[in-house]
Amino acid sequence: MYPRVMHAVCFLALSLVSYVAVCAETKVATNCLVKSENTHLTCKCSPNNTSSNTGNGSKCHAMCKCRITEPITMLGAYSAWGAGSFVATLIVLLVVFFVIYAREEEKNNTGTEVDQCLAYRSLTRKKLEQHAAKKQNIYERIPYRPSRQKDNSPLIEPTGTDDEEDEDDNV
């Protein structure tokens, strides 16, 4: 997988874990007599359908639940729970995600070492091929000349004697 996809998945998993940590509300069958920072008493009014002949004919029976919310410990202490905490956590993580990759994009715009190395190699290869082609053309234009070795044999073999040359001088 690509590293960006893996990091995005990790950020989403972390946001889900933080959502679970913030929203970890356990319903306890107590009457919330011991008041602490983590206990919340929520009550709802449900009409009681008893056949009583009273004045208004409807009674409200309060149904209360005591909830204990566990404070968040991962991303810092803020007192938000429910869907708001998930959205806030997701926004914070996405901002961090995009800040990290904006910095990484700035580094990549200067060029990575691998790309520079490949570009240098291809340029060097092209220059070497051009140089070899020029040398080939030069060697094709110059006729073949065997190298002269230093041996003590004379270049011109004597065919006659020196007497013939002396005769020409007398004339």
Swiss-Prot record:
Region entry Disordered, spans: 133-171
Keyword Glycoprotein found: yes
Signal peptide: 1-25
Lineage: Viruses, Duplodnaviria, Heunggongvirae, Peploviricota, Herviviricetes
TM ranges: 80-100
CC per GO annotation: membrane; virion membrane
Protein name: Protein IRL10
Biased composition (Acidic residues): 160-171
UniProtKB keywords: Glycoprotein, Membrane, Signal, Transmembrane, Transmembrane helix, Virion
Membrane topology (UniProt): Single-pass membrane protein
Organism: Human cytomegalovirus (strain AD169)
InterPro entries recorded: Cytomega_TRL10 (IPR009284)
Cell compartment(s), UniProt: Virion membrane
Annotated family: Belongs to the HHV-5 RL10 protein family.
Residues annotated as glycosylated: N48, N49, N56, N108
